[in-house]
Amino acid sequence: MENMAEEELLPQEKEEAQVRVPTPAPDSAPVPAPAADTALDSAPTPDSDPAPALAPAPAPALSPSLASVPEEAESKRHISIQRRLADLEKLAFGTEGDVDSASSLNSDNPGTENSQTCPLCPKEKFRAYSSHKLRRHLQNLHWKISVEFEGYRMCICHLACRPVKPTIVGEQISSKLGAHYHCIICSATITRRTDMLGHVKRHVNKGETKSRYIAASTAKSSNEILKETDTDIQVFPNYSIPQKTDSYFNPKMKLNRQIIFCTLAALAKERKPLECLDAFGATGIMGLQWAKHLGNAVKVTINDLNENSVTLIQKNCHLNKLKVVVDSEEKEEGDALEDDGTLGDIQVTRMDANVLMHLRSFDFIHLDPFGTSVNYLDSAFRNVRNLGIVSVTSTDISSLYAKAQHVARRHYGCNIVRTEYYKELAARIVVAAVARAAARCNKGIEVLFAVALEHFVLVVVRVLRGPTSADETAKKIQYLIHCQWCEERIFQKDGNMVEENPYRQLPCNCHGSMPGKTAIELGPLWSSSLFNTGFLKRMLFESIHHGLDDIQPLIKTLIFESECTPQSQCSTHAPSNTNKQEENGVFVKTTDDTTIDIYSAQGKRKSNEMAINLAKKQKTDASTAHPPFYYNIHRHSIKGMNMPKLKKFLCCLSQAGFRVSRTHFDPMGIRTDAPLMQFKSILLKYSTPTYTGAQSEGQMPPAAEDTVTDRVEMSVSDKAEASGCRRW
């Protein structure tokens, strides 16, 4: 049957909305056709039509918001957007006069295909043999289900004008066709009517109903230029959608890029030049920042497997006046770049990251794949140089943060549950995976720092060659016993003998007071320190030197966390034989560090001896390492009690003789070596009762006992002043 049933109009609701930007069309065309290099197909008439030049209807009076639309922008409006039903019928019948004239209504001859074809449907989808049937089709299947906005109707369109995905080389990928609407403001093509209503509503909320917005959209280029840390990059229009773009760029990862830059800047002070690799370049912004700000101190290699990303990286290099080296040959495009000492050469490669890391050796490797990075760890440690640095950014937070526990077991081979310290647990899982990969290559690691924020988990380690270092690293991977009632935790004791009652290792007595099994075994995890204080202080100095103000608060928090010292009690004294830079009460060492002698060592034999001495020194300094994990003060607050301020509680814990500091993992977390029982007792001691809540529930203790009421009467301010702490 040639005619289309009227009930088959509604679009498939499973199709997603796609947005396109119209491009200028020739002035002579009655219906605008976009340029060939855009991601937009035109709205053609049927193939058999001779496509005569139809005279447009007289322009109706525009609404107040669209009254100032210029004629050029008005001509670019899609044919499915009309003000009256008569205007839509004029497109179908092709008459300049009234569509109700006898000449148009009585043209029931099937041979006149131009007057019997719907302008919004392809010929193979609908053909009418009478003008009455065509008018009924336009009214019922296009006009009645349209979306109205300020006097205009956005009718449903069945033409092959859905956008296609463009590429840099000009290729186009076809997309699934279907019924859709054209937005009158931004020319977006959206499949569902409800989505179109919400789309227009968002335009109204943003105030994007003026004609200048239409003109700005048409003049918008295909690629956008962004700037971050004095580095310009060119990105695709859909750069923020990793599933739909060839080169993903996430502005929320700015903190990650800055802290990695500080890491490389601190490493560049040790030896020059450094062979650096950004294994997953995408837009190349990270490698561009290295080469632009560190100059000749680094030799940057940016790699990506996608051909379009490699082309974009090369464009971004020339945009920042950096020379591109492809296959060890300088690539010259256009005018010769000026010879500036601050500009460096960037080698751009296109190959699998595992292959590249097997072929070449580097001093600094950064891995930032889409998802987990465990598939690239073996290759990274295979050829990395001694005392080099490997940084790993993991964005599979659903598995690391215990939302997809089966994925964590599959990728990292560990058992994990959601705990109050889940972010540090995620960091220790990644470090354990890195340590196992290094040990398989007869290498050990020294963790410089580990950061776990909302969008990523970043781990930076230094590589120590030799089987001795590998064995020492492997011993630091242990299982964790976690109590599910009170959330007390402790690493299992070393040894291979099976313990009769593993619950005795926990400081709590929940197993004796609670029925059933109360604890679970998590891991394997990294059980040693997560921070190197000396390296973090050098990173802080580099951040101050390069003016990276956004990252300085995080690095300061990491320094206090590594020393497990409150910020108000941080040590301001340092040996006189070191060069120091003071910043907010913290002395930053610039030439002295625990491993600074190793960096200046020349020769493989001497550096290996220095690495062994470093391992021995780390073993003696194990007692001064920060305590593992932290407690959330809100998680352990007492019902019916007002807990003290966080800074005041830190002072109280320090007064009781415990090491204490805040943590970047949790804004309300406290890292301390106090057991949970002592933590709760001190929290109870300095909490004040909520009298209304306590009286209503009958929880007010008797006055004769030494309870919370008696403890509150103690002068907290006097004790704080006696210990040198200020009351907040």
Swiss-Prot record:
List the taxonomic lineage: Eukaryota, Metazoa, Chordata, Craniata, Vertebrata
Keywords, in A-Z order: Isopeptide bond, Metal-binding, Methyltransferase, Nucleus, Phosphoprotein, RNA-binding, S-adenosyl-L-methionine, Transferase, tRNA processing, tRNA-binding, Ubl conjugation, Zinc, Zinc-finger
Domain Trm1 methyltransferase, residue spans: 224-683
The protein in question is named: tRNA (guanine(27)-N(2))-dimethyltransferase
The residues that hold Zn(2+) are C483, C486, C508, C510
Cross-link Glycyl lysine isopeptide (Lys-Gly) (interchain with G-Cter in SUMO2) maps to which residues of the chain? Answer: K580
The record's family statement is: Belongs to the class I-like SAM-binding methyltransferase superfamily. Trm1 family.
Q: Which one Pfam family would you cite for this protein?
A: TRM
What EC number(s) has UniProt assigned to this enzyme? 2.1.1.-
Highest taxon, organism lineage: Eukaryota
List modified residues, type Phosphoserine.
S63, S607
Q: What class of enzyme is it?
A: transferase
Compositionally biased residues, Acidic residues: 1-10
Task: Tell me what gene encodes this.
Answer: Trmt1l
